[in-house]
């Protein structure tokens, strides 16, 4: 059995949760992939995958082996370029996840700089409002807002995002400018929640005494940050959003800031990555570059 090839097959089966899809990826018969994984499990003396009729899931032992196997293959890739000091010679794949608003307004406009410096690196970019499972889904690093991450990962604080309250000119012409949070009962607030069915607390205001919540009007709740911004631009209500996500709209006059003295608490931003023994050089390079780019826009 080719141990390295078996590890590659195992990793792909784990990530795709399917023997068939992994076999298609490698252009191999499904039976061949299954036999090699079984041989790997027999050699290790433990079950790595839990097989059902619909999907394949990692066992606890499989999760541990998955992470170590990823490290081994990453280190082998690094070893190929060990004596090549030129950063342009570094190659390999990076899988990252960044919130949609940050990816659209900050990362993607600057990403060509990194790819130009490191043409051998292939990037897989994921953007979700809901947190991804860093370990299970095989991410090298992610940008997280708010709450601290789960076990098995390391969080590197990057800074805070300033929040602003804003609405479209059309909305303000129709409903007027609120002068204080107490006025919001007669205004429409677009509400955001990652999970529909969970009623948001209301309009958030940070103060020296902590966060305060004010009652407000409004009939729209969304679970997508992209739709949240679009709703604000469409005049459906006031939104509370990171300034970086609306800076162009504010400059162009498509949104206008309201209640500047009553902003929500700044949003903490962290760079999160798996707790491995040693990060690959390409992961380190990307995280250093990303932290430098983010620094320009954080408080």
Curated annotation (Swiss-Prot):
Name the UniProt key words of this record, in alphabetical order. DNA-binding, Transcription, Transcription regulation
Annotated HTH lysR-type domain ranges read: 1-59
Q: Which residues bind DNA?
A: 19-38
Name the InterPro entries for this protein.
LysR_subst-bd, Tscrpt_reg_HTH_LysR, WH-like_DNA-bd_sf, WH_DNA-bd_sf
Q: Tell me the domain of life.
A: Bacteria
User: According to its UniProt record, what is one Pfam family this protein matches?
Assistant: LysR_substrate
UniProt entry tagged with the keyword Transcription:
yes
Q: Which BP terms in the Gene Ontology apply to this protein?
A: DNA-templated transcription
Gene Ontology molecular function, alphabetical? DNA-binding transcription factor activity; sequence-specific DNA binding
Q: Which family does it belong to?
A: Belongs to the LysR transcriptional regulatory family.
User: Protein name, please?
Assistant: Uncharacterized HTH-type transcriptional regulator YhjC
């Amino acid at each position: 059995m080719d141990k390295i090839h078996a590890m590659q097959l195992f990793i792909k089966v784990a990530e795709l949760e399917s023997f068939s899809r992994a076999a298609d990826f490698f252009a191999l018969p499904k039976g061949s992939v299954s036999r090699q994984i079984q041989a790997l499990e027999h050699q290790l003396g433990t079950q790595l995958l839990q097989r059902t009729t619909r999907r394949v899931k990692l066992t606890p032992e499989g999760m541990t082996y998955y992470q170590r196997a990823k490290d081994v293959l990453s280190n082998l890739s690094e070893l190929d370029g060990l004596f090549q000091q030129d950063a342009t010679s570094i190659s390999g794949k990076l899988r990252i996840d960044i919130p949609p608003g940050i990816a659209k307004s900050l990362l993607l406009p600057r990403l060509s700089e990194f790819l130009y410096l490191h043409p051998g690196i292939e990037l897989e970019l994921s953007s979700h409002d809901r947190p991804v499972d860093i370990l299970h889904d095989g991410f090298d690093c992610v940008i997280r807002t708010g709450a601290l991450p789960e076990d098995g990962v390391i969080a590197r604080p990057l800074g805070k995002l300033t929040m602003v309250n804003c609405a479209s000119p059309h909305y303000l012409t129709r409903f007027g400018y609120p002068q204080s949070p107490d006025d919001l009962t007669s205004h429409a607030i677009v509400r955001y929640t990652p999970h529909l069915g969970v009623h948001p607390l209301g309009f958030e205001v940070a103060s020296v005494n902590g966060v305060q919540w004010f009652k407000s009007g409004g009939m729209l709740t969304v679970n997508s940050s992209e739709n949240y911004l679009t709703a604000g631009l469409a005049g459906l209500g006031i939104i509370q959003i990171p300034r970086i996500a609306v800076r162009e709209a504010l400059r162009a006059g498509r949104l206008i800031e309201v209640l500047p003295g009553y902003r929500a608490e700044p949003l903490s931003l962290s760079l999160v990555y798996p707790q491995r023994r040693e990060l690959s050089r390409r992961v380190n390079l990307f995280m250093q570059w990303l932290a430098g780019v983010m620094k320009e826009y954080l408080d």
